[in-house]
Structure formats: structure tokens, C-alpha cells
Amino acid sequence: MSLSRTTQLPFAKRQFFQVLARNYSNTQDADLVVIGGGPGGYVAAIKAAQLGMKTVCVEKNATLGGTCLNVGCIPSKALLNNSHYLHMAQHDFAARGIDCTASLNLPKMMEAKSNSVKQLTGGIKQLFKANKVGHVEGFATIVGPNTVQAKKNDGSVETINARNILIASGSEVTPFPGITIDEKQIVSSTGALSLGQVPKKMVVIGAGVIGLELGSVWQRLGAEVTAVEFLGHVGGMGIDGEVSKNFQRSLTKQGFKFLLNTKVMGASQNGSTITVEVEGAKDGKKQTLECDTLLVSVGRRPYTEGLGLSNVQIDLDNRGRVPVNERFQTKVPSIFAIGDVIEGPMLAHKAEDEGILCVEGIAGGPVHIDYNCVPSVVYTHPEVAWVGKAEEQLKQEGVAYKIGKFPFVANSRAKTNNDQEGFVKVLADKQTDRMLGVHIIGPNAGEMIAEATLAMEYGASAEDVARVCHPHPTLSEAFREANLAAYCGKAINNV
């Protein structure tokens, strides 16, 4: 019997402690110490405790949840959701027969965001308590293969001896050379989530996921937003080219401005005015942009500073990541790493999966993850989501594929919701019909992509999904119709 997600805990505990008795002494203070209380770390800590390990989580910040819950996924979604409601009230309600006057109360919107964050971070604390996970607030440094020291705010140091150490320290904002972030006028994603007033003009460096989401928030609230992107498309790496073009067109209609194939040369500040110097990446054409808020969103980098990796001779790769094997194990057998500090997309759900799998592996179970089945979502309006390969990747790999598409304008639920922009696109192997990638732009794309992810995880064909009964009327029918088009060349409800 192997340890899996369906294994009963008594067996898991029994097998785990048999492994410990064979390989370790019993003098340590913990079975596992987790460095970092973000999505990967806190989930791993809880899972480890559920498997019977005495677990301690060390987090440097006062609240648990990491970047995602405190200054990332959660607060940004709160602002995206509420700014969308305001935009609908001002620009969409009248067409629905709703007459009203809506205005922005920014302090109240920020308070609602903060309340969401507070409830969720507090919830993790309760989960730790319920699962008997130890929590130490302090900065963790690895001083040996089985020892972590946590320096607390009062200057005291707590030493934790552990059979295993799991690094889940996350990532930090990548700085832009020559531009100093003050989180007031020149801001990172952190500052952009807490601006005290709506900018008149905002320039966003980077038209990836973070830049587009936060730019959308402030554009809806009244700012004139221009995104400067070095690449020739919006949406970052991995997005399907056709989807990206439609995405840019949609955001442009909303008032978003874009300068693509353009690099930022520098920025200077004079009082409340920021001057941004840009240059065409292809033609070398120079121009200047003026704004009162500059958002730097050029990505994130692994956070490993001060972890003490050199104390255990762990070297980083050329991108600052911790090298691990297929069991998330470093070159030191007792030290593991997951999430943003290792290779792969910097996504909270990817870190969560790795955390669960890693501790199951420590307990003697199997470890497997298919990174081709890790979905990505951009929570703008319309939403954009994808999983698997894009057309460009399949062409580059020389894979013969077929396409099935279905527009939301032909979907009954999208019609009744008066939210019918976008489409579902399915890429399937031309010979076997196996789904290779799914790309959605449109309403609730982030929710719909879960079905596609499940189908791909189980190796489904387009025909498999096309033959599954979907409830009517729902947006999910568009996914079925796209698979029908991929499988037999034609959807039912589209000419």
C-alpha cells in the first residue's frame, strides 16, 4: 500500500515513524521545520501535521499567508472585484434597466480589501492551532543540515532542531535598474494595492499578469493608464498569441494604453511629476511619458537572502533558484524546497501542490506533478485563463494539432448575462485527439479553466469532454462546444 492523498492517516503515521526510527535519532525538537508561511509553506506545514509529524513553521512577518494573502493574490482580487462593480454601475447598469448614481469611496474600498486579508490570514492561524502546527515569528536561517535558527523581533534567537527542513520562502519584487521604489509615487505591486488616491496618470512598466491586473484596477477607478512592455504582446509568457491579441484589443476599448516592443531607459522625479524615458526595442525611437504614479511590475525573483544556504553548501542556479530533484530534495538529503524558490511558474497553487507532495514524499509516499497541468489566470475583465500548451509552443515542437473554438456570443448564459466577449479555444492532438492545451478569454475564465485542468490531468480527449453532459444554461457549455468543434470539426450552437 502506497501513501497517497487518499491514504488513511493512521497508516501514514505508522509508515512515517517507521522511516524516522530507521534513519534518525530521537533527540530533535521537531520532525519538520518549514521556512515560510505563504501558500506553499503553510499548506505543507498543515499536511505534515496531519500525517503525524511534529511541525514548526517559521515566518518572518507578523501575519501568515505570505505575499499571496497579504500583498498579492488576495488584496488584488478584492480591488479587482470591487472596482469592476463600480465600473459596471457607472457604465453598464443603465443598459440592464438599473438607474443609479455610483461614486468611489476609496478609503471604504481599501477597508474592505484589508478586512478580507485579515480574515484569511487569521484563518491560517486557526488552522495551525487546530492541526497543532507550531508557529515561530522570526527570520529563519539554516545553520546545519538539521538546524534552523529563528531571529525574533526582540533580538532573541530560537534554535529548532529538525529531522527535515523545508524551504518555502517565496519570492520578492524584481527591482528595475536605476529606478528606486518608494511605495508612494514609484510603487511595486505592494504600494499599488494601497494608494491613498486615484492617480491622474499611471505608467506601468510591464504588461504581464501583475501589471495588467493592477493597471485595470486604477484605470477603472479613473486613472489614465499606459503600460510599457518590452515584448510584442500583453499577458506575459505562456499566453496564447491569439488570446493575447484579443485581450489587448479588449483592454484598449476600456481605455488602457499600450506601448509594446518598448524598453524603459529610466525615470526621474520632479515634485509630483515622474518622467519616464522609453525607447523602441526595434526602431530605437525615443519618447518621454509623464505620470504621477509609476508602477514597476517586471516580475519577481526567488527570496533566498539570509537563509544560510552557504552554511550547508547549497548553491543557487543561474536564476537564483534552489536546485531540487523530483522529490523537491536539495543536494542535502534532509533539506527540501518548494514554490517560488525553485524552478517553475511563480504561482500560489503550484506552491501548494508542491508542499503537499513534498511532505507526502518525506513520509515515504510517491511524488508526482505534471507542470503542464498547472493553470494560469489573469483576473481582469474579461478574465484570461489557460492550461497546457499554446499554439506557438506546439508549432515550435513540431506537434500536429487541431483547434476547436467556441465564442461566448453564441453561449446562452453569456447572452443573458450581457457579458459575451471572448471565446474558448481547445488544442488537441491531430492523431489521438488528446487535449494539449485550453485557452479561455471571457467571463469566469478562471473558474472554467479548472474543468480543463482536470480533463488534461486525466489525459482526456476532446471527444471525452464533448460527450459529457453539461448543465444548461451555463458558461461551461462553451467549453463542451469547443471540444466538440475540436473532435468532429463543428460545434452545435455556432455557424
UniProtKB/Swiss-Prot annotation:
Its EC number is 1.8.1.4. FAD binds at residues 59-68, 77, 169-171, 340, 346-349. The active site is at residue 472. Its main location: mitochondrion. Disulfide bonds join 68-73. It is found in: Mitochondrion matrix. GO terms for biological process: 2-oxoglutarate metabolic process; fatty acid biosynthetic process; pyruvate metabolic process. GO terms for cellular component: mitochondrial matrix; mitochondrion; oxoglutarate dehydrogenase complex. GO terms for molecular function: dihydrolipoyl dehydrogenase (NADH) activity; flavin adenine dinucleotide binding. Binds 1 FAD per subunit. Signal peptide: none annotated. Pfam families: Pyr_redox_2 (PF07992), Pyr_redox_dim (PF02852). It is an enzyme of class 1 (oxidoreductase). The keyword Chaperone does not apply. It catalyses: N(6)-[(R)-dihydrolipoyl]-L-lysyl-[protein] + NAD(+) = N(6)-[(R)-lipoyl]-L-lysyl-[protein] + NADH + H(+). The keyword Mitochondrion applies. Its cofactor is FAD. Keywords: Disulfide bond, FAD, Fatty acid biosynthesis, Fatty acid metabolism, Flavoprotein, Lipid biosynthesis, Lipid metabolism, Mitochondrion, NAD, Oxidoreductase, Redox-active center, Transit peptide. Belongs to the class-I pyridine nucleotide-disulfide oxidoreductase family. NCBIfam families: lipoamide_DH. This is Dihydrolipoyl dehydrogenase, mitochondrial. It comes from Caenorhabditis elegans.
